[in-house]
């Protein structure tokens, strides 16, 4: 569908998710560039549907002239890549939606992977009768120490209002509204449904439960657990196994590559 503008928003240390001295650490940022190219970018280039663009969101205070940021600009990909500051996001989208019926924003981190049908799946949900739609997943994989042989099922807690998701998306029907302040970052992980209902109430539209969708597809995404990812800092007080079950993934190398891209050295 050529009337869809789809941005995948990737937080490249764009907000204060850890101590500021770590947030601006050059070694951390250099590693982040390599991790992005190995994981998130590989899985996005592996998508069946490539009708989307990537936005790498960087912190408002990061110097754009430092090597890690310059390296992001040097990345060669068949997917269009934008590098912008977090506070520039709304204006950027407003400047680029003319002529489109739907704006889709999806979120993932630079160190995670999504299955090859994720973009295709969310774009199939565009419906002219639905003003604002949410889609997330609740059955993921955790990969420990960058080793595909060391992967486990991950079932984030779903409380009926939201779930910890790697690939969350919202569809904004631009025929109903052009309030671009609403994107995937407008909804929280755990309180997304009440926020969506509030939007419907504020705009005098009828909300239906099917407008908030949790997809139960098995093995939808891979949460890459390693020492440099933001949650290793953000959740340092939690048990190291909080993000996985005891159910090991028993799949061959080719299955991982076909589903998530060739991230395996």
Regions found by a protein language model. Give the residues of each.
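Short loop/turn segments at strand-loop or loop-helix junctions that form parts
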Residues: 7-20, 59, 136-137, 224-227
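Conserved catalytic core of nucleotide-sugar-dependent glycosyltransferases
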Residues: 88-98, 106, 113-201
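A short, charged/proline- and glycine-enriched loop
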Residues: 1-7, 101
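Active-site-proximal specificity loops/subdomain of glycosyltransferases
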Residues: 17-33, 57-107
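Short, acidic, metal-binding catalytic loop of nucleotide-sugar glycosyltransferases
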Residues: 24-30, 38-51
């Amino acid at each position: 569908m050529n009337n869809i503008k789809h941005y995948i928003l990737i937080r490249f240390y764009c907000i204060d998710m850890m101590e500021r001295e770590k947030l601006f650490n050059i070694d951390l940022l250099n590693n982040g560039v390599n991790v992005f190219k190995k994981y998130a970018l590989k899985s996005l280039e592996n998508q069946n549907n490539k009708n989307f663009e990537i936005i790498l969101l960087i912190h408002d205070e990061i110097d754009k002239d430092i090597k890690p940021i310059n390296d992001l600009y040097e990345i060669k990909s068949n997917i269009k890549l934008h590098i912008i500051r977090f506070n520039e996001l709304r204006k950027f989208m407003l400047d680029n939606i003319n002529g489109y019926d739907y704006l889709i924003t999806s979120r993932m981190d630079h160190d995670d992977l999504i299955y090859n049908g994720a973009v295709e799946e969310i774009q199939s949900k565009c419906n002219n009768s639905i003003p604002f739609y949410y889609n997330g997943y609740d059955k993921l994989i955790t990969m420990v120490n960058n080793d595909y042989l060391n992967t486990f099922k991950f079932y984030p807690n779903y409380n009926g209002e939201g779930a910890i998701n790697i690939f969350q998306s919202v569809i904004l029907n631009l025929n109903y509204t052009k309030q671009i302040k609403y994107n995937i970052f407008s909804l929280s992980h755990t309180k997304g449904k009440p926020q969506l209902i509030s939007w419907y109430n504020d705009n005098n539209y009828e909300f239906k439960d099917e407008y908030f969708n949790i997809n139960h597809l098995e093995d939808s995404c891979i949460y890459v657990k390693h020492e440099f990812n933001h949650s290793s800092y953000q959740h340092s007080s939690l048990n190291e196994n909080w993000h996985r079950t005891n159910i090991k993934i028993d799949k061959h190398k080719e299955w991982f590559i076909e589903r998530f891209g060739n991230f395996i050295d």
